[in-house]
């Protein structure tokens, strides 16, 4: 049944009576059948700008309709190549430039309109680039000509006209409401609210105008009663009129309302609702204006002051949005024209009348279902602002800001479409107010149709492709349409009666006197509200005084904290100095350990070289003695055999002749004895000199070696002592670190950080307190709770910041502390290894020296024995009877030898030559061996002397006393002793060779 006020009836009610659970009898839905969004593409003809630019047509569409495929040539090719390379998009319907407005309505909006009459929520969206005909498609020519629409009328006028024609034919009771909102620069605006479009912030009755806000339906029950009472005062007419004010036809329809028995469940819900309404009405002041929607939907959870969603699913509703009741299409068209006048429109290079905002025209239908029940359905007609290229449209300043906001909201809409198509787990509805408003239409419980408008010109081919991409993706979005919920008729009738009584009372009070007046009850109610507000102001003042005193205490605490922070800063600086000192010591210790390690390696190599040199020297000495003995023995045996052979030959071949041979034999005998004595004397002198030199040089050499070993031992003891001191310093720093962790870690006051949070908290509290004083309609308890939450949140943030700061300060100290432990352990292990290695090396050197000393003593003893044996050789020669007998036989055989004397002399000369050769051979062998050995030893000694300066440069100061001179003093005696032994050996060899020649 239509409901009408004489002045069209402004309805400032912010509540929709269809959402509250207690006011809805039931919600009948069809099975959860998923339906895809219907997508249609409308391509206009080229406009004057595109024709003047001579931009060719690149979009291939039918002239009117018929095909479901649209292709666009973006390559610039022609003929078959253009058809092969063209991009193709498939949608549900395609309309060309020849398609009329009536055809668009019948094909796209008509099916949704029938579902809307049946009780479904429906949405029609127009999407596309600027200047492609979106507003023309949705609105067109909204005027009536002789009671008829023109051919250019858009979807909204046709829906309004067809709606009332259909309702009159069905002859059912109904109520129709309209609302018109605009989204401009991400701000919602009610286009039907004349006060919000003026310069004043208050309405004609002195009420403050409130901004539109979007809420989820799940938060509807949490709205406070103060907001409901404020919204009630803005109410004008939200229900059907009485019979006296209705037209005859409307009155006839109204009489058809009758009350029948309801099911028990419906009666119980109705009785509960009546009881709740009676309690709420008795508690409110009689003079205050009543909010129709709030009184209809009161529950135990409180009254609402916003337009609630139409169902109990997770939808959205808009707070402070006005809904206007209409009884015919003309009233709806008047509201549409009123809203369009206030819509943001500007001129750009691409469009002379470019819409700079998104608009949603909503039609809400309360249609009688059966008996006392009315079904609620909605139809949202959305005209989206067009996306545009700022450079091409020439938008500057405010126009550029508008274009950016439009493109941003459309970009978010594109992301929502992509997420729905990809079935993503997160749909970014909340990133834009546009997507929040369209949340039910995209993937929700609404039947939706999308009309994409495009331009055929090549100059806009890029935007056309983008529009078609989104349209083809939106075709894959699935919705689950549901029938609307129910509301009871008696609730509507009661609210109508209360609202009309209030309006008549105010009207009579106004007519009785000049100016604007109100009834006595209304005046008393206003006074009581003022007294309540005064009490709230007093409470706010007391709260401000309390906060001021608390602020003074906080200032004092802040001063104390500053002093504490200064002392802590001094301690921190001292601690930083200590840490730097410890770091320097650790670096120095690390370098020292590296130098010690390098020196240790070099010393080990030198020790190995010395051991190898001594071993090689001993080996060569033994080989030389063995070779010399073997060679001498071999030559002497050879010489002896030759002499015996010659003597035998002389004995066999000689003929005793009577010659004067006796003097010669005596001479030979004397000469032999003389040679033996000479050889004995020289041998004694040689061995005595050798023994004397060895006895004189050996003690010096061993004393020097022992002194150097003692020096090395003292140096190593000093080094070990210094290492121990460094380790004790490190241990002391470790104890200091432990003391810091025990006394200071997590015990810093961090008062400066707390003061910052306290200051910010105080500023926020002061700001919110000022807002609280200015907006005294809000409840003080809610304000205090919010302040408490804010303080707790800031304290939590401050605590977290203190903990994070303390951990950040401690982290480098902890890492250095752990590294110092590793360095201490490495230093300790390396020190022990170095000490053990040097001790073992010194022990080996000492054992080697002892062995060498024993060997030399044994050699001296052997040489003394050989000298004593040589002294006995002469006496043995004198007492040798065989020797004397031989000489006697020589005398007897003098005659025999006389004939062969020449041959014997010749043979003797040849043997003398052989002995000379033997001597030369022995001398060459000794020289070659001595030269090689001396060269090898000299080379080894030179290498050692070269390494000593390099080591002394890299050694620590406490080891610098071990230099090349000390090593030279150790090596030189050994070198001289070896050279003396070689010379003595050569002298002995030469003397022995000479004596052998003399003997021969």
Curated annotation (Swiss-Prot):
Coiled-coil region list: 518-615, 860-904
Region (Disordered): 1-28, 220-248, 260-312, 970-1000
A Pfam family recorded for this sequence: Kinesin
Superkingdom of this protein's organism: Eukaryota
Example GO biological process: mitotic spindle elongation (spindle phase three)
Gene3D superfamilies given in the database record: Kinesin motor domain
Keyword Metal-binding: no
Localization per record: Cytoplasm, Cytoskeleton, Spindle; Mitochondrion
Modified residues (Phosphoserine): 972
Biased composition (Low complexity): 220-242, 277-301
Biased composition (Polar residues): 1-26, 261-276, 302-312
Main location: cytoplasm
Entry GO terms, CC: astral microtubule; kinetochore; kinetochore microtubule; mitochondrion; mitotic spindle; nucleus; spindle microtubule
Residues annotated for ATP binding in this entry: 128-135
GO MF entries: ATP binding; microtubule binding; microtubule motor activity; minus-end-directed microtubule motor activity; plus-end-directed microtubule motor activity
Residue ranges constituting the Kinesin motor domain according to the UniProt record: 36-477
Function description: Elongates the mitotic spindle by interacting with spindle microtubules to generate an outward force pushing spindle poles apart. Following spindle assembly, CIN8 and KIP1 apparently act to oppose a force, possibly generated by KAR3, that draws separated poles back together.
Family designation: Belongs to the TRAFAC class myosin-kinesin ATPase superfamily. Kinesin family. BimC subfamily.
Additional detail: Present with 238 molecules/cell in log phase SD medium.
Protein name per its UniProtKB record: Kinesin-like protein CIN8
Gene, per the UniProt record: CIN8
